[in-house]
Amino acid sequence: MENNNFEVVSVSPATEEIPEDIDVLIWVAPINDPDQDVLDKLDAFLSDNEEKTLLYFADTTQPVLPRLEAFLEKWGIAVEPSSVIETDNRKIINSNPYFSTTQIENTELTDTMTDISIPLTMPFARPLDTVFETNMDISTSVLLQSSETTSVIPYESESDLENWTPEEYGPFSLAILSKKSFEDGKTSQIVAYGSSVSLSDSLLSSGSFSNADYYLSVLNTLTHRENVIAIQSKTLGGQELGLNTAQVFLIGLSFMIAVPIITLGFGMYLWLKRRNA
């Protein structure tokens, strides 16, 4: 995966400024609410008219994070305190109702995928909502969603799953793109995903799912790379996927193009930048 030309660096924005040559930040399942200073740096990062991107991944293990949630809502993204669960046994993977296939609703970030027929999965996902479709210079769109037979289960009901009864059905949003447009035609964006487990090593290396292909396409598209030959590590066959809901991130994210990744505090902020030619 190193062959996809991404390099990794780490920095703490809680104690230093975000480097100017960072293009993409990946923030995975923080468990502590960021302070206002960090959020101000993120806001400046996305407001400098330089086509910057924040990829945010939620997780069902996260507590309530009011400052972070308010920050995302300003961009039109709400992360709900529940879990997506599949009610149709034919769509369940590994006999786990929290693990099922995901539908691509919007192909804006899938241009360089090699095969969109291979299923994508967002296990142990939190549902997302669009707070608005457009608000001045910000617009939102749904990228991924669950099936029509999924439901959502509140956190407090998960311990009593056998006695739980679905009250509403999907599809539910699992990925939302929020884009801020500038006067010169440039944009900055936040892409929020409901599942950090979708980045697990088991899924990214599995030939049964297109997660690695999808995320590589997302980064290729956001960093305006064209004519890219993707090199993806695949494990073929029906091996068991050892998934859990811990904050899982592929610490090299090195399979995705050459962009430094920066780890911030609890839940990892990962920053990406293109290598200078």
Predicted stretch roles:
Residues 218, 242-244, 263:
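Charge-biased C-terminal accessory regions appended to nucleic-acid-, cytoskeletal NTPase
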Residues 97-99, 241-248, 257, 277:
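Alpha-helix boundary/capping detector
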Residues 263-277:
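Juxtamembrane interface at the cytosolic side of transmembrane helices
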Residues 1-227:
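Acidic, S/T/G-rich, low-cysteine, solvent-exposed domains in lumenal/extracellular/periplasmic regions
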Residues 256-257, 263:
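Hydrophobic alpha-helical transmembrane segments of integral membrane proteins
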Residues 104, 239, 252-255, 275-276:
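Short, intrinsically disordered/low-complexity patches at protein termini
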Residues 198, 205, 230-253:
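Short, aromatic-rich amphipathic segments at membrane interfaces
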Residues 224-231, 263:
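Intrinsically disordered or highly flexible coil/loop and linker segments, enriched in small
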